[in-house]
Amino acid sequence: MAMTSRERMLTALKNGRPDRLPCQVHGWMPYYLKNYLGGMDQWQAFERFGMDYAIYVSPLYSYDEKDMANWLVECKGSETDESGNRCEIYQITTPKGTLRKKVVHTDVTSYDTEYLLKELKDFEVWNAYYPVPRAVDFTPIQVTKDRLGDKGIIRSHPFSPGQGSPWQSFCTLFGTEASIMLGMDEPETLHHILESIVEKTLRVTEMWRNTPADMVEVGGGAGSSTVISPNFYREFGLPYDQRQNALFHEAGLKVVNHFCGGLMPMLDLVVELSRSSTRSKDPRSCEPAAYPSAIRPRVHAARGRLRV
């Protein structure tokens, strides 16, 4: 008997055998929807191609007014560069100084050209005043899940200041190369920073219990073996990912770790991530037969995704 899309995807995520391989995309790019699919939304795109739906929606957060008053975000101007891209400068005012970043918006994506944190002292300002939610509201997730029905699953993003994990988030704040050099030169300082970041994520994740979402997406390309060595990830990535993954599991969520890069040299570390699912962008040639024999029974692969 044919499974529903929801049954199919959840079966695959449990390392079971669905009636067929689930078919989905890792999010629809607005540029693609606008320019290649006639402006349809993600719901219409999934339906058009007969895919299994994976809808991204996260909780709404409520903050203490005093915390927000100590973290005033202003756009200080917008300009157009020589390529026609819109450039914006953001300034954040806190009681202990200001932080600044520059963001470029293209038709396809947005990216930072000036990191928010330039020096280590900037992190201490950030750490003291970056607002952490006091309450969560799952209404947007429940509304989406009611609409979705058995057509697929709900994926959420964690509360993290950059992407999905402490190491990746710090790289987006401080720069990947600078973050790597800090780990080599001042490992204790980097551990202090990563601990501060993960503590904020854990505080919010404690409020995620009973979320209607099915999965949370963590990680990022900065944790892959394309960017750092497996030993570097073992020290500065794995311990923090394990802690937040464990708490997400306690909240009833599947966890997908996106390394978005090389993974084969660090498969033993993937196993240590616990019951997470891991997504890489390794080539199709990286099939289970290539895995070390000690690891092979503990992972399941389906087109670039490893489930532990």
Q: What are these language model-derived features?
A:
Residues 1-28, 32-35, 124-308:
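Active-site loop segments of alpha/beta catalytic cores
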Residues 26-28, 60-61, 92-98:
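Short, flexible beta-strand-to-coil junctions
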Residues 32-71:
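Segments that shape or occlude catalytic/ligand-binding pockets
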Residues 42, 86-88, 137-140:
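Generic hydrophobic, aliphatic-rich segments that mediate packing or membrane embedding
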Residues 49, 83, 96, 174, ...:
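Short glycine-rich loop/turn motifs that provide flexible caps or phosphate-binding loops at active sites
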Residues 59-72, 77, 157-164:
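Short, glycine/charge-rich beta-strand/loop segments that flank catalytic centers
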Residues 71-132, 151, 157:
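A contiguous, low-structure linker/loop signature
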